[in-house]
Amino acid sequence: MLSDLVFGKLFLQCRKLNIRLIPQSLNRGKAVPGGVCGFWGACGAGISTGMFISIISGATPLKNEPWGLANKMTSKALDAIGSIGGPRCCKRDSYIAIISAIDYVAENFNIQMEKPVIKCIHSDKNNQCIKERCPFHE
C-alpha cells in the first residue's frame, strides 16, 4: 500500500534520529485504501504525512496546535502532489509526500531528516508516466 511506504520511510527516519513513536503508529498507514486519490480527492501518500505529524506531535481531535500541524502537513503534501497534475503515479506522489514531510518537520520541529536524492527508474513500467512533467524523471 502506498500509505505504508510513505509511513515506513518517515518512521525509519525517526528511528535513525532516536525519536520514540507509539507502537500502533504503523497501523494507521494501513487504514488508507488504494485509489483514494481519485475516489476521495486526497492522495494516500499526502494523507500519510498528516498521520505521521499527528503521531510525532501527539495530536488528537481535541488538541489545538498538534491538530493544526497535522492538518497543515496534509494540505502541504496534497498541494505539492496536486500541483504536478495527473494522472496519478504512486511512486512520484510518495516521493513528493516524503520530501514535503521532511521539509515540514525541519520547519516546525527543528528536526533535520535525511532528504533523499530521487531519480525515477520506473517510467518505462508506467503507461501513464508524465515524463518531463515529473520532477524525478530521468
Which residues fall in each region the model found?
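Conserved mixed alpha/beta catalytic, RNA-binding, or beta-rich assembly cores of soluble enzyme
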Residues: 3-15, 19-63, 67, 71
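Secondary-structure transition/hinge residues
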Residues: 15, 105-109
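Cysteine-cluster motifs in flexible loop/terminal segments that predominantly coordinate metals
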Residues: 1, 111-138
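Short alpha-helical linear motifs
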Residues: 45-52, 90-97, 116-119
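A structural-propensity feature for long, helix-poor, extended segments
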Residues: 56, 63-106
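Short, mixed-charge aromatic SLiMs
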Residues: 25-39, 70-85, 119-129
